[in-house]
């Protein structure tokens, strides 16, 4: 008598169930990882402007003339995750796209005539996605940011 070889239907269903459970756990974690990577790209876009604004403010005695494309501040740029950017009086505004769609980040420098730039205040705004807002606040965290 020949023996049949192979898996039973129940064994296959158990394996499919295990794969489904692992996928349900793994996919959201991977999506959060991708969002943090996108936020890091947005941060990398901001950092040169931060330095340029600080130098402009020190050289010109304030933030009033620190606009994008003038006084040593580069013209605003876009990247894969940044759809729009502006620099006006030292305030750097970034708008997200793709996995950061709907996110806006506003970085505002603090100025003191005696001490110069005293720090940066971040403002991460997105409607109905508190996880992305928290991730934004974590990534755009400086020792002196509020």
UniProtKB/Swiss-Prot annotation:
Residue positions, PTM N-methylphenylalanine: 7
InterPro entries: N_methyl_site, Pilin-like, T4P/T2SS_Core
Membrane topology field: Single-pass membrane protein
Stored Gene3D superfamilies: Glycoprotein, Type 4 Pilin (3.30.700.10)
Any GO BP: type IV pilus-dependent motility
PROSITE patterns in alphabetical order: PROKAR_NTER_METHYL
Membrane-crossing segments per the record: 7-27
Protein family membership: Belongs to the N-Me-Phe pilin family.
The protein, known as: Prepilin peptidase-dependent protein D
Organism: Escherichia coli (strain K12)
Gene name of this polypeptide: ppdD
């Amino acid at each position: 008598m020949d023996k049949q070889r192979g898996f039973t239907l129940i064994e296959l269903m158990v394996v499919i169930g295990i794969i489904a459970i692992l996928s349900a756990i793994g996919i959201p974690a991977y999506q959060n990882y991708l969002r943090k990577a996108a936020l890091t790209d947005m941060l990398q876009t901001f950092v040169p402007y931060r330095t340029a604004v600080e130098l402009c403010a020190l050289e010109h005695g304030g933030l009033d003339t620190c606009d994008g494309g003038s006084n040593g501040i580069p013209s605003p740029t876009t990247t894969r995750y940044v759809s729009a950017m502006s620099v006006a009086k030292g305030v750097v505004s970034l708008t997200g796209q793709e996995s950061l769609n709907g996110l806006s980040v506003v970085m505002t420098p603090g100025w003191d005539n005696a001490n110069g730039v005293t720090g940066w205040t971040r403002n991460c705004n997105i409607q109905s996605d508190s996880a992305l807002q928290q991730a934004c606040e974590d990534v755009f965290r400086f020792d002196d940011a509020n």
